[in-house]
């Protein structure tokens, strides 16, 4: 099974840290969302992951724009890092890929170090995140998706 994760990671690299671990342990390919163009061959991959930090309760626009191009029938999953992991921040992007006819196989979110706005004045929040347990959980999530996916 060939898996790709299309991602954008800003600020402190929280999402990249999660994606790097998943890529290493699940043999997934990583591609920055800004590098995906009209020549991207979706057929090269069985599973498509979308990963992003969360800004204003949604995935970064660059990742969402790529998701809007996914062909019908593809299996997808979502990974995100956020300041407060209190809801499914992948809900909006899931709807986008479902409307395109892709199959949503789940999402994984964890906290990330955050110094946005006034938080920088106090040194930020979630300084130790994503932590080792969260990285392991992300890997387990993707392994489970890969094991249960049926084309």
Task: Indicate residue ranges for each PLM-predicted region.
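FMN-binding flavodoxin-like domain, especially the glycine-rich phosphate-binding loop
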Residues: 3-6, 10, 16-17, 24-31, ...
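Conserved SAM/SAH-binding loop
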Residues: 33-37
């Amino acid at each position: 099974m060939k898996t790709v994760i299309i991602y954008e990671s800003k600020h402190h690299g929280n999402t990249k840290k999660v994606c790097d671990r998943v890529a290493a342990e699940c043999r997934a390919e990583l591609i920055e969302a800004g590098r995906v163009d009209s020549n991207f061959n979706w057929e090269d991959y069985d599973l498509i992951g979308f990963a992003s930090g969360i800004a204003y309760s949604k995935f970064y626009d660059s990742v969402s724009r790529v998701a809007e191009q996914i062909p019908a029938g593809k299996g997808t999953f979502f990974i995100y890092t956020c300041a407060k992991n209190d809801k499914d921040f992948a809900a909006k992007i899931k709807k986008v890929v479902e409307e395109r006819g892709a199959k949503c196989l789940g999402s994984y979110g964890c906290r990330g170090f955050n110094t946005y706005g006034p938080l920088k004045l106090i040194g930020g929040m979630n300084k130790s995140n994503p932590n080792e347990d969260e990285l392991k959980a992300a890997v387990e999530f993707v392994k489970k998706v890969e094991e249960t996916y049926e084309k």
